[in-house]
């Protein structure tokens, strides 16, 4: 993917003309916070409002015939995406990534104008908002933005599970015509370990020499999925990283690769003084290192929302277990709010389910009251998207209904 993190014009006062190129504004790079946050006594207007980001996008003529996507890793909190003044998409979650296809809207061989209208206020229609939060929800294009140039047929997703420590099961999601598929298992050095080819979207790879992913030896592998034309040439590819490991909560505790592991962990928020959420990759990785190497944690909870892929990547590499959860804090909104929250679960699971460090999906709004129909839906969705992991949800009422697989409770005694 091509980075689009530099040379964005930024304004804290959006106007309709901004999407059409009116005015000139200071340049910023991503990740970026919409308002610099003082160390003490911040007011909402210091970091919240309706702002705009804009930059040029050159698309060469040789991209004709390909499919072009913009990927936003984190746009807090309600984003509208414009290309050459035309609104193409909107996204109502500041904590999950989203993609926008621009193939039919782009001007080839010319400079295009990409603009984002970003509402960083606490919109009660958008989870986690609607009541008070016990954390500050900073705004901005605070994670990376990319241009993804793909073939006419596209591998949308690659999902890898490891039912045993020597077997990988691969599920592909492909859009387009009936291209032939090839999946290749690679070790950390890029050496080929195994390969499978066919016309289906499900493959099984056995590798007797696989080294399991564990806390002490977090061995990582990759699956490279490719689409092939009639001549055998690669027309599209997607690579994901994973680890051979089994993870299960049982009555007697948590078991990784069949061995009981004591979970000693902390909650982690993604905010920093002055920069809000807009921490670069190095800081995201440093937090994971501190948790594992200095604080001797075996686990971390991403309270109370999905966090940077750089942080989760570092957890994969260091051997730090992760309990990640949907955005929210105590409040449950109306029916439309719940539908958005369910969509948050869908995005969270599909975007993070290949990470071996993640052992638990949090599908209950933190410390919320019971809402059985809502939580049956979030649980069922997580299980359907990822049958390999269990669900949980943190509560503070002892007698609340347990619909998840694993009981989680905040003990404030």
Give the location of each predicted region.
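Surface beta-strand/loop "capping" patches
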Residues: 151-177
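Conserved, mostly hydrophobic/aromatic
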Residues: 85, 145, 221, 258, ...
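Short hydrophobic beta-strand segments in globular cytosolic domains
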Residues: 88-89, 193, 261
């Amino acid at each position: 993917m091509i980075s689009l993190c530099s040379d964005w014009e930024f304004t804290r006062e959006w106007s309709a003309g901004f999407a059409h190129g009116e005015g000139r504004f200071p340049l910023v790079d991503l990740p970026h916070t919409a308002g610099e946050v003082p160390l003490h006594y911040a007011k909402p207007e210091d970091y919240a409002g309706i702002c705009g980001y804009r930059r040029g996008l050159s698309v060469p003529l040789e991209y004709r015939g390909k499919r072009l996507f913009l990927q936003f890793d984190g746009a807090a909190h309600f984003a509208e995406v414009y290309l050459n003044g035309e609104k193409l998409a909107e996204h109502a979650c500041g904590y999950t990534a989203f993609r926008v296809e621009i193939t039919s809207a782009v001007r080839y061989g010319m400079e295009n104008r990409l603009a984002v209208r970003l509402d960083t206020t606490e919109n009660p229609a958008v989870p986690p908002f609607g009541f008070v939060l016990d954390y500050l929800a900073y705004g901005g294009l605070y994670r990376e933005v990319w241009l993804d140039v793909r073939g006419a047929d596209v591998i949308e997703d690659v999902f890898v599970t490891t039912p045993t420590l020597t077997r990988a099961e691969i599920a592909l999601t492909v859009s387009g015509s009936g291209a032939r598929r090839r999946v290749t298992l690679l070790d950390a050095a890029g050496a080929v370990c195994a390969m499978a080819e066919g016309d289906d979207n499900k493959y099984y790879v056995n590798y007797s020499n696989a080294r399991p992913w564990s806390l002490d030896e977090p061995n990582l592998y990759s699956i490279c999925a490719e689409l092939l034309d009639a001549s055998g040439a690669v027309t599209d590819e997607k690579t994901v990283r994973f680890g051979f490991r089994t993870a299960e909560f049982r009555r007697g505790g948590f078991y990784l690769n069949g061995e009981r592991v004591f979970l000693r962990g902390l909650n982690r928020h993604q905010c920093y003084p002055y920069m809000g959420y807009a921490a670069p990759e190095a800081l995201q990785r440093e937090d994971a290192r501190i948790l594992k190497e200095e604080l001797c944690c075996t686990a971390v909870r991403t309270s109370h929302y999905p966090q940077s892929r750089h942080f989760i990547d570092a957890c994969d590499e260091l051997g730090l277990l992760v309990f990640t959860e949907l955005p929210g804090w105590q409040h449950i909104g109306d029916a439309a709010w719940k539908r958005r929250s369910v969509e948050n679960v869908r995005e969270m699971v599909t975007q993070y389910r290949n990470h071996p460090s993640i052992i638990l999906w949090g599908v209950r709004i933190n410390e919320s009251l019971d809402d059985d129909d809502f939580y049956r839906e979030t649980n069922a969705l997580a299980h359907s998207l990822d049958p390999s992991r269990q669900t949980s949800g943190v509560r503070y009422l002892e007698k609340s209904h347990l619909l998840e697989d694993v009981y989680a409770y905040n003990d404030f005694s």
